[in-house]
A protein has these predicted regions:
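N-terminal Sec-pathway targeting helices
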Residues: 9-13
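Alpha-helix N-cap/helix-start motif
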Residues: 220, 224, 251, 290, ...
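Bacterial N-terminal signal peptides
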Residues: 14-25
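Short glycine-rich loop/turn motifs
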Residues: 120-122, 294, 318-321
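Active-site/binding-pocket entry motifs
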Residues: 174-176, 206, 281, 296-298, ...
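Active-site-adjacent loops and short helices of periplasmic peptidoglycan-processing enzymes
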Residues: 94-256, 260-269, 326
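Conserved active-site loop region of the serine DD-peptidase/beta-lactamase
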Residues: 267-301
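Structured C-terminal helix/loop/strand segments within mature extracytoplasmic catalytic/sensor domains
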Residues: 3-8, 27-112, 126-135, 139-143, ...
Length: 360
C-alpha cells in the first residue's frame, strides 16, 4: 500500500485527508459518549431540585388563589349591607312627601256654624294616629266631669293589681253622702272585683266605684291621691279629683285633658271591654241584678265605639268620652256640658259623620 501511495502522490494526499477526517470523527464520537452520562448524572439532581422547588411554589399559588376566592366571597357577603346602606342613603335622600294630616272638611258639613250648633259646650276631637286635633271648642275650659271620673278610678284600681276574683263587700262607707243618690247594691252585698269593675264602667254604679277605691292600699284617701298623681303623670294639668265616683262637682277637668285619660284607659283591654259591654248579670247575694250600658250609643250600636264613659250631674250637664275607629283610624271624641242626653248623643253622631266623610 505504501508503495502504491508513493507512486500516486495525489491519491496519497486525498487518502491522508480522508483518514484524518475519519480519525477526527471517531474521536469526537468517543468524547460525546463520555460526556453524555456525566451530563445526565448532573441533570437529574437539577431536575429534581427544580421539581421540588416548583411544587411548593404551585401550592403556594393555589393557596393564595383559594384565599383570594374566600376573601372575595367574604367581601361579597359583607358588601351586601354596604350596598343596602347606600340604597338606604339614596332612599333617605329622596324622601316622598309626608302624607297630609287628616282634617275635617267643609264639604262634609264641618263649618263654623255647624260647630256652633253643637249641644255640647265643650268638644274635642283628636286623631290619635297622627296626634292631630281635628276639632276644639272650649277644649281648655275647666268644668265638672261627673262620672267620667270613673275612668280614672278604673285606671288607678287596675294599677293596684288586686286579684279580680277577690270578693269585695259594700259597706256604709260606700254610700253617697254628696248627692244622696240610691243604689241597687245594698250595704252588705258582695261581688268580685271583676264584677265591681264591670258595673262601675258599664253602668256607672257609684257604690261599686266607691268599694274599689276603699279596697286600695292605704284606703280611699290614698286612692284619691293616686288619681291626682296619675293625672299629673299623664299631663292633665287642669284636672283635679276629690273623690272616685264623680258625684262631687269639684272633680274637674277639660276636654283636652280627658283625651289624655282616654288614651291611657284605652291601653287596658279589660277597661275597653267593660265600658262597651251591652249588659251583664251579677249576683250580690241570693238574687240577681241585671245592668245595662249607660250609653245609648253603645246599647243601640249606633257608632263603632271601642271605649266610652258617660257622666252627668246637674253642675256638669251631660258628657261622654269615647274612642272610635273610623276607616281604620283611631279617633278620640270628648263632649261635655250638653243640656240633655239626646243632645250629647246627637253631637257624637254628627261628629262621626264628619269623620267618616273627611277621612280618606
Amino acid at each position: 500500500l505504501t508503495g502504491l501511495i508513493a507512486r500516486l502522490p495525489r491519491a496519497r494526499t486525498t487518502l491522508i485527508l480522508a483518514l484524518s477526517f475519519l480519525l477526527l470523527a471517531f474521536a469526537a464520537h468517543a468524547s460525546a459518549q463520555r460526556v453524555q452520562p456525566h451530563r445526565a448524572a448532573h441533570a437529574q439532581p437539577h431536575a429534581h431540585t427544580k421539581a421540588v422547588k416548583k411544587t411548593p411554589h404551585r401550592k403556594k399559588k393555589a393557596v393564595k388563589r383559594r384565599r383570594s376566592r374566600v376573601t372575595h366571597q367574604a367581601a361579597q357577603r359583607h358588601a351586601a349591607p354596604a350596598s343596602q346602606q347606600r340604597r338606604a342613603k339614596r332612599t333617605t335622600a329622596v324622601r316622598p312627601p309626608a302624607p297630609a294630616k287628616p282634617k275635617l272638611l267643609a264639604s262634609c258639613g264641618y263649618t263654623p256654624r255647624a260647630v256652633a250648633s253643637l249641644h255640647s259646650r265643650a268638644a274635642y276631637v283628636l286623631d290619635v294616629d297622627s296626634g292631630t286635633p281635628l276639632l276644639a271648642r272650649n277644649a281648655r275650659t275647666v268644668r265638672p266631669i261627673a262620672s267620667i271620673s270613673k275612668l280614672m278610678t278604673a285606671v288607678v284600681a287596675r294599677d293596684a293589681d288586686r286579684p279580680l276574683n277577690g270578693v269585695l263587700r259594700v259597706t256604709a262607707r260606700d254610700r253617697d253622702t254628696i248627692k244622696f243618690t240610691g243604689s241597687r247594691l245594698q250595704v252588705g252585698s258582695e261581688l268580685s272585683r271583676r264584677d265591681m269593675f264591670h258595673i262601675a264602667l258599664m253602668s256607672s254604679e257609684n257604690r261599686a266605684a266607691a268599694a274599689l277605691s276603699r279596697d286600695y292600699p292605704g284606703g280611699r284617701a290614698a286612692f284619691v291621691k293616686a288619681m291626682n298623681r296619675e293625672a299629673r303623670r299623664l299631663g292633665m294639668r287642669r284636672t283635679h279629683f276629690r273623690e272616685p265616683t264623680g258625684l262631687s262637682p269639684r272633680n274637674v277637668s277639660t276636654a283636652e285633658d280627658l283625651a289624655r285619660l282616654v288614651g291611657a284607659a284605652a291601653q287596658d283591654p279589660l277597661i275597653r271591654y267593660f265600658s262597651t259591654d251591652l249588659s251583664t248579670t251579677v249576683r250580690p247575694g241570693d238574687g240577681e241584678l241585671v245592668y245595662v250600658n249607660s250609653d245609648p250609643l253603645v246599647r243601640y250600636r249606633r257608632l263603632p265605639i271601642r271605649l266610652q264613659k258617660t257622666g252627668f250631674i246637674n253642675e256638669s250637664g251631660h258628657g261622654v268620652v269615647m274612642r272610635m275607629r273610623v276607616k281604620g283610624r283611631r279617633e278620640t271624641v270628648v263632649l261635655l256640658g250638653a243640656p240633655t242626653r239626646a243632645g250629647v248623643s246627637s253631637d257624637a253622631i254628627k261628629i262621626h259623620r264628619w269623620l267618616s266623610c273627611s277621612i280618606q
